C-alpha cells in the first residue's frame, strides 16, 4: 500500500522547554515559572511551553498514521539539538522528508527509516525530534498497511518476539517531586521518580544532604503507602550537571 500524502500540524507537548543554562546561572522559581532572562539561543523565556509537530502519513486507502515530533526539556544544552519550535521545523519536514515518503510502499519500517535517517540539511542530520516523530509515523503506517500491530512490526523486522508482560515505564515527577511521587506510588509506576534535581541549594544540597533526605523519604513513602509488598519499583533520579 502506497503513501499518498504527508501532513504536519503544530501542537504542544505534555511538559516544557527549560533553559538549562539560565537555571544553572540562578534563575529562580515563582510557581511554575522561572524568573530571569533566557541565555540559550531560541528561548524567549527561561521556561516555555513544549512544542511538538504531529506528522500524519495518509495511505492510499484513506488510513492515517500518526507520529509526534517532540524534543527534550533541556533543548539546546549539553550538546543537544537546538530548541524545537514547530514554525522552524515543519518546513524542514515538508521540504526534505515528505518528498522522500510520497508514493513509497508502506511495507518496510526499517528500510524507510534508514532512508529518512540518512537525510542531511546543510550537512547535518535531521533534528532528533523529527527523526523520533517521523519514525513513529512510519511504524504506524507500515502497521496499518499490513494489518499488524506496531509491536508486531518491530518484532518481525528485528527478529524478536512481542513481550507477554508489560514493559516497565520510567515516570517523571517534574519539580513537584513529593506529591507526584505519591501519584506514581498509587498507580504502581515501575520506575520512578526522575525528580528533576537541577538546583544545588534547593534540591541537592552543598554536600548532597537534600538529595539524600529526599531518597530516604521516597523509600519510606513507598514502604508505608504501597498497596502490597509485591510493589517494588526501581528508583531512578536524574541530576543535571550542576
What are these regions (language model features)?
Residues 1-54:
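Short, Gly/Pro- and small/polar-rich lid/capping loops
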Residues 53-61, 65-71, 180-193:
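Short beta-strand elements
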Residues 58, 64-148:
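Metal- or metallocofactor-binding catalytic centers and their adjacent structured scaffolds
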Residues 82-96, 205-221:
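Well-ordered, non-membrane alpha-helical segments in soluble/globular domains
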Residues 107-112, 150-153, 223-237:
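Flexible, glycine/charged-enriched surface loops at secondary-structure junctions
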Residues 140-144, 148-214:
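Glycine-rich, mobile lid/loop segments that gate access to catalytic sites or pores
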Residues 179-186, 216-230:
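Acidic (Asp/Glu)-rich catalytic clusters
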Residues 240-242:
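Conserved small/polar residues in nucleotide/adenosyl-binding loops
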